[in-house]
Amino acid sequence: MKTLLYIGMSLFFIIGVVLLFVMENQRSEAVQKEMKMEMPKEEMNLRKATFAGGCFWCTEADFEKLPGVVKVISGYTGGNKENPTYTEVSSGTTGHVEAVQVYYDPSKITYEELLDYFWKHVDPTDAGGQFVDRGAQYRSVIFYHDEEQKRLAEESKEALSRSGRFQKPIVTEILKFTRFYRAEEYHQDYYKKN
């Protein structure tokens, strides 16, 4: 009787392990499939740029108008809180800014063109926010993903400073990109929904 009990328990354990493995494998395949659906094959050669220009609703809408920009995602970056919420970022205590992640086709639009567009849609002399949105979470920042983006961002900022277009100094920060947290779904394509 004990032998049958041990065999039954062993079989139950083995079946449980196999089921867990199968379920985890299916979940992993589903996640991979979802990622592929989110980024079609022809979009795998896209480049990424990250900008903070005040309220991400407006910044997202601005960049989505550009030919060569494939996708723009609103989110949070630059701070120290993992997985922040809109309420937390809005409080100004996380160090994050509202930002957009721009996926673009470099054969249709260059990073330099994105920078030029960015400068035309922010007040680069205002460290306290952008337009009616006040607070450090609304300041303008260019987040670079590699040394080439850093160089181009610094050169464009210097050119803007020399242009004489602004009386005050350019205070937009240029910071190394660390991590981007996608904003809640109701913030995505906000201008289309409202």
What does each of the following model-derived ranges do?
Residues 2-194:
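Flexible coil/turn and secondary-structure edge motifs
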